[in-house]
Amino acid sequence: PIYPQKKIGDRMLNIHTLTLGDYGTNCYIVHDSASKTCCVIDPGYTPEKVLSEVNALGLTVEAILLTHGHFDHVGGVREIAAETGCDVYLCADELTMPPQMTAGQLYYTKTYGEGDTLHLAGLTISVIRTPGHTPGSVCLLIGDAMFSGDTLFAGSCGRTDFPGGSDVAMRASLRRLAGLSADYRVYPGHGMDTTLAEEKRYNPYLR
């Protein structure tokens, strides 16, 4: 795991990255330095490993946040929710996705969508709907961090040829991200983190 810290006001945003499973899915444990609770983003595999890391950090899980519903991002959700009693947030548009893409593992307790702001684990989380990879993909903004799921990667973007994907929607979502004025450090669903400024400059899908 890597543990970057970001200053937000007089507090620190802590981001712990676990890369899980055969597809190398990035799962993020995110918490405020003053809080003993955390949010877990996209626990796709090995829930026992995620829970072990949370426990080692002395935290409890307040919520699971899903950027989208593909099986490699949701496979550990049900077990973590059962163990902790936490809520699980998902964009309602993901419910239209063909079930074979979720491997029957889609589980949630609450929905969120465009323009929603959540206050969880001492964090303020803004939701941007970014369809394309899936019908209900979202990016999550926490301070100057963007959790982009499979919408934006370092040097690339998510596939749109899966059932429920849309190239037209993806192009519109990427244009929207390219239009954001603030610079964010981008934490994607796969691969290394990057910055939005770097992607605007070098990523052909954002130009």
Which residues make up each language-model segment?
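Conserved beta-strand hairpin/beta-sheet module of binuclear metal-dependent hydrolase folds
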Residues: M12-L57, C139-G149
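Metallo-beta-lactamase
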Residues: M97, A103-G104, T124-R129, T134-R207
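Short, Lys/Arg-enriched N-terminal segments with co-localized hydrophobic residues
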Residues: P1-R11
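Active-site HxH/HxHxD metal-binding segment of metal-dependent hydrolases
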Residues: C38, Y45-T124, R201-Y205
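Core dinuclear metal-dependent hydrolase active-site scaffold
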Residues: I15-L18, Y28-I29, G115-L141
